[in-house]
Amino acid sequence: MKLPIYLDYAATTPVDPRVAEKMMQCMTMDGIFGNPASRSHRYGWQAEEAVDIARNQIAELINADPREIVFTSGATESDNLAIKGVAHFYQKKGKHIITSKTEHKAVLDTCRQLEREGYEVTYLQPEANGLIPVAMIEAAMREDTLLVSIMQVNNEIGVIQDIDAIGELCRSRKIVFHVDAAQSAGKMPIDVQKTKVDLMSISAHKMYGPKGIGALYVSRKPRIRLEAAMHGGGHERGMRSGTLATHQIVGFGEAAAIAKTDMDSDNERIRRLRDKLWNGINHIEETYINGDMEQRHCGSLNVSFNFVEGESLMMALKDLAVSSGSACTSASLEPSYVLRALGLNDEMAHSSIRFSIGRFTTDEEIEHAIETITESIGNLREMSPLWEMFKDGIDLDSVQWAHH
């Protein structure tokens, strides 16, 4: 067993060896190294064919038309292109956007930028379980609403939003619907023909593909128009210029193909391991799960251990690679904005750890994790005066702390 144990699959996944092998065939002189836009010789044609195959594989994963897949550098760029692209193209229709407080920073910061440009954004507060009722979205809609952006699976707490119902609502009101599917694509079935989604952001490195490549699904029926952010050679039907990175795209395609075939067996095993982990630690006193347990991605577990400081717990769990909050914001010592939006106080938000399980997690690793967590929390609480006061029956909320 290799230490530290990797339990941070929501931050990134290792590249599947089958994916790495495919990528290696697209880099060197004896491989498919040409520029896919070179139309005058075989090197370009081979690269273009490799890109086309990958585009098909990614389209099949979400049941889209390959012409609806636009390659980007990742889900952050896809989110930016989708939200800014729609806002700028359809600004005559209105300047109101609806999103939620628990979205990824790539969506929230893009919306903040649009606010600086004169757009109006409504940030919905989810319920305590992390879910956003469709009625709440409907109540926020106005005549000038042009876009709704809601993620499918939350990166911190793993809850799944009802994008089918939200899609129906948006389509009936002729409002563009964007879904950030970075955490769900390749991990759960998605069918863009059934779900009325207009735009969907996808990332390769969350599904055992390489970093630095992603895609934006852009619906053709109804046709969604975007204002491009990257100008140049007119690649990707003018929506995203720049030479296509054949090796990354081929890796992305292979990762999507593997995800499609292995999804059921992967998820069954991952769910079993997640339940094993939760059953192994939920006997610890004052341990709470964050987010809805039913509407939840099978590999995700966000747990608050009361009276334990999250950062000190992370240090104590040096054998486990886990995180507090999302990888993009875990460097700041602010409590997670996602957990604060669920109504957790600062102390509980600070004492939370995200465990995310994936394709290469083993039973042995989960057993070791349970032991380590149980032992570390016991040790940290022994040192905590707050824990001692709590055990003595003192109501900590009623304590008047002196300010020196």
UniProtKB/Swiss-Prot annotation:
The active site is at C328. Pyridoxal 5'-phosphate binds at A75, T76, N155, Q183, S203, A204, H205, T243. One of its GO terms (biological process) is [2Fe-2S] cluster assembly. [2Fe-2S] cluster binds at C328. It is found in: Cytoplasm. It is an enzyme of class 2 (transferase). The keyword Iron applies. GO terms for cellular component: L-cysteine desulfurase complex. Keywords: 2Fe-2S, Cytoplasm, Iron, Iron-sulfur, Metal-binding, Pyridoxal phosphate, Transferase. It comes from the Bacteria. InterPro entries: Aminotrans_V_dom, Aminotrans_V_PyrdxlP_BS, Cys_deSase_IscS, Cysteine_dSase, PyrdxlP-dep_Trfase, PyrdxlP-dep_Trfase_major, PyrdxlP-dep_Trfase_small. The modification N6-(pyridoxal phosphate)lysine is found at K206. The keyword Nucleus does not apply. Belongs to the class-V pyridoxal-phosphate-dependent aminotransferase family. NifS/IscS subfamily. Homodimer. Forms a heterotetramer with IscU, interacts with other sulfur acceptors. This is Cysteine desulfurase IscS. It comes from Shewanella piezotolerans (strain WP3 / JCM 13877).
